Amino acid sequence: ISSVLIAVTFLAIAFTLGCERLQRSEIGDATAHYTVDATWPQTPDDLAWDQTPGVTVDSEDNIYVFTRCDPAVRVYKTDGSLLRTWAVEDSNGAHFIRIGPAGNVWAANIKSQTIRKYTPEGKLLLTLGEPGRAGADQGHFDKPTDMAILPSGDIFVSDGYGNRRIVHFDATGKYVNEWGQTGTKPGQFALPHSIVADSHGRLYVADRENARIQVFSTKGKLLAVWNNLITPWGLWISKNDDIWVCGSSVKKKEGENALAILPPEDQLVMKLSRKGTVLLRVPLQMTTDPLGKQGELNWIHGIALDSQGNLYLTDIQGHRAQKFVRQP
């Protein structure tokens, strides 16, 4: 089995970052390793791949991959074997995919302007938003990117490329509240690209084009802003409330103070505490070759972990999902 060894640098950097101040402790480091599992996934030759923005893992360690061609949803075991596939409407608008607390599958679609809830087998249960129509009112989205589902069933949608807001719905899909607007000030968004919730109900939003993560209460109160750690593309939260982030280094446009987001100059994964402390920094191999080699990524987008701590990463330009195994 071929593998690509990826050095992982643990950084004990205490970034306790509130809305107005940054506290920093001394920096220490240690080293661990991940390797790419070249046997994962095992996909039939006739199953095509396209841009692959989303990945999630259910309670049984089944891995759901969301790609922009049909069948858009591919479900794999940890050993790489393919369990099942199913199609969605407007697959070329696929974005992030999540598993709710009841085991149902939630999918954000930036083309159909919807958030949809499915059974694990692909039966449609609920649609939020009006398919094919963008808007900024209580019943519409404008390119919604992601959703966080609380144990209560409440739904928080990051909306998105067009509206730059977070929208709250109850478990039945009824509108409750919203907050956010376009901007760079605390509580504003340039692009709310991904969202997760911890076990205490705090919401973590990847404000990608502002190169920061913002933390909110479920009422929309701003709790913290984590600047200059990473340009965050995708988020994942573990059962013990560690926040995993995939993205790229923060960089400025040459000769300007503005941030440069695209194209990314590198590929990173970080593990953060609930206080914004960087617990782990994982530099990944980047390629600009559309084919790429195993272990390389090109516009990393989605991140998920299974119960054994294995990483599942997807990328846009690389058109694939990959598994990385942590080494002792």
Residue ranges and their predicted role:
Residues 3-16:
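Bacterial N-terminal signal peptides
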